[in-house]
Structure formats: structure tokens, C-alpha cells
Amino acid sequence: MTDTPRHTATATTHIAEPPDRVWAELTHPGARWVLGANIETDYRPGSPITFEGHFFGRVFADKGRVLAVDRPRLLHFTHFSPMSDLEDIPENYHEIRIVLEPDDGGTRVTVTQENIDTEQHAAAAEGHWRDALATLAHRDGGTRTSHR
């Protein structure tokens, strides 16, 4: 493991739907709420998870492993992006936790991405997660979200 400081990105939103409904949207096959990516996994601990799509005109194929699932409260997985130009070794994988909590008649969704190599990349990741959560919250075309 490296002694280089690592960084964390966090994004949170409120969705005016119950956790079961948000979980269903989050895990729906073909739900392209993460940067328009196609997400493939069976959501079982130990299973692979892949994200494929286009980002600023570049094709990407990110990967990881599902670490934990507690429906409808937690999705925890590792993540590696070849676009990072980092070596594909465990030390360079992010850990991402998506937590759903009942909140004021809806759901508070918090995404935490850990083990990011630079402060600049952490800030960019936070922005991407805010965008992803906005997409998740507006999936039905409505305006049912507030960012915090």
C-alpha cells in the first residue's frame, strides 16, 4: 500500500420515493443513471460489476466487484477505471458505497467514493456523483429531488 494520501468524494440527494422504489430504480437492468453507463452485475457479493459507456467522447469500460448488498439500504463495490491511466492493481481500486435511508417521506441517497488518488480527481468524482444522483432522481422526468 502506498503512503500517498488518498481522497474521498461524497454526494447526497433526497428523492421523494420510498427506499424500495429508489433501490428498484438504482438496480434496474439498463438503468443508465451513472454517466449513461450500462451497468452489468447480479448484485451478489463477490460478483463482478461493470460500467460501459461514453464519457466526453471516449468509450469506457470500468470494472469492480460487489462487496456487500443490503437491499434496500446498501450497495458497496470496488471500482477501477482504465481511463485513470493507473495500474490495474488492488491499491488503485476505489470503494464506493451507496446508502439509502428513509428520510422525510422519501429517501436520502448518499454515495461515498474512497481511495481517490488526487484532490482534483475527488472533486471531479463528487461532481459526477451529483450528476448521477440527479439522473436517478429525475428518471421519471419529474422534479422530485433536492441536493444537499
What are the roles of these predicted feature ranges?
Residues 39-42, 57-104, 114:
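Hydrophobic-ligand binding "helix-grip"
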Residues 6-12, 48, 61, 74, ...:
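Intrinsic-disorder/low-complexity, polar/charged segments enriched in Ser/Thr/Lys/Arg/Asp/Glu/Gln
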Residues 19, 38-51, 58:
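A solvent-exposed, acidic/Ser-Thr-rich amphipathic alpha-helical stretch
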Residues 27-28, 71, 138-142:
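Residues at helix-coil transition
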Residues 92, 114-148:
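A conserved amphipathic terminal alpha-helix motif
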Residues 27, 107-112:
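Ser/Thr-centric signal marking residues that sit
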Residues 22, 49-51, 66, 77, ...:
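Hydrophobic pocket/interface hotspot
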Residues 1-40:
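Hydrophobic ligand-binding cavity/cleft-lining segments
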